[in-house]
A protein has these predicted regions:
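C-terminal substrate-recognition "lid" of short-chain dehydrogenase/reductases
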Residues: 2, 80, 118, 224-253, ...
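Substrate-binding pocket helix/loop in short-chain dehydrogenase/reductase
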Residues: 97-98, 102-110, 216
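Residue(s) in the substrate-gating loop at a strand-loop-helix junction
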Residues: 141
């Protein structure tokens, strides 16, 4: 198994890509800290993992809180006696415009895309160094590679994630720690459907909900949205020893949108 005996944390693991990743990693032998703000969703993922013979620790956390962003690392490491990887998957789409932006929403976008990953990374580095190395994975986006007129503030934040990953990779490589990002395009998740159904998205592009879902999910050469499992597969590779010389990349998983 590709993550046999590895101990890791997955944030926003209650649904979509995070859920798919946590379940897949456990099937590949990882011991997984399953993190989400939704207690029922955490319990569901842990149950699914354990039903299939895997091991998981459910952690309910609000990652807008600095203490929780640190606690998810220390709690997982204490429970499983170590830490080998973190997938910082949590994010927030933010406002659809740059005009009349509510600054509370702007702050939340930065908190859930940037601030929390800094705090979690800080805590994780101590644990990874104690293990002699490890892997840090971050969810950016194609919006952090090419920008998106649908979500300019989100693009701002995700460009920040990509920049952080590239700089971090150079800084921690000496400690046998790799840092990479996965950059999903439109993926058919609950978050995508909630996002495109928002009134600010519909007014921005002048489409009703169903047309907008098709537009956001059907663009690109492959003509369909991705599946959460397809992103989880890429994440698995980047976290595994198969990617032992892969460091500092931002890997698109987008069906060719950024080709």
């Amino acid at each position: 198994m590709r993550l046999e005996g590895k101990i890791g944390v997955v944030t926003a693991a209650g649904s979509g890509m995070g859920r798919a990743g946590a379940i897949r990693f456990a099937k590949e032998g990882a011991l997984v800290g399953v993190v989400d703000v939704d207690e029922d969703a955490v319990a569901s993922v842990v149950n699914e993992i354990e039903k299939n013979g895997g091991k998981a620790k459910g952690i309910v956390a609000d990652l807008t809180k600095d203490a929780d962003s640190k606690r998810i690392v220390t709690e997982t490491a204490k429970y499983f006696n170590g830490l080998d990887f973190v997938w910082n998957h949590v994010g927030y789409p933010g406002p659809a415009s740059v005009e009349g932006v509510e600054m509370n929403d702007f702050d939340l976008t930065l908190d859930l895309n940037l601030r929390t990953i800094l705090i979690t990374t800080d805590a994780a580095l101590t644990e990874l160094r104690a293990r002699g190395g490890g892997s840090l994975l971050f969810t950016a986006s194609t919006s952090g590679l090419a920008g998106s007129g649908f979500s300019p503030i989100y693009s701002m934040a995700k460009f920040g994630v990509v920049g952080f990953v590239r700089a971090l990779a150079k800084r921690v490589a000496k400690d046998n720690i790799r840092a990479n990002a996965v950059c999903p395009g439109p993926i058919d998740t609950p978050m995508l459907r909630v996002f495109v159904a928002r009134p600010d998205q519909q007014s921005t592009v002048g489409m009703d909900k169903e047309d907008l879902v098709k537009k956001r999910g059907g663009v690109g050469p492959m003509g369909r949205p991705g599946r959460p499992e397809e992103v989880a597969n890429a994440a698995l590779f980047l976290l595994s020893d198969e990617a032992s010389f892969v460091n500092g990349i931002a890997m698109p998983v987008d069906g060719g949108i950024t080709a």
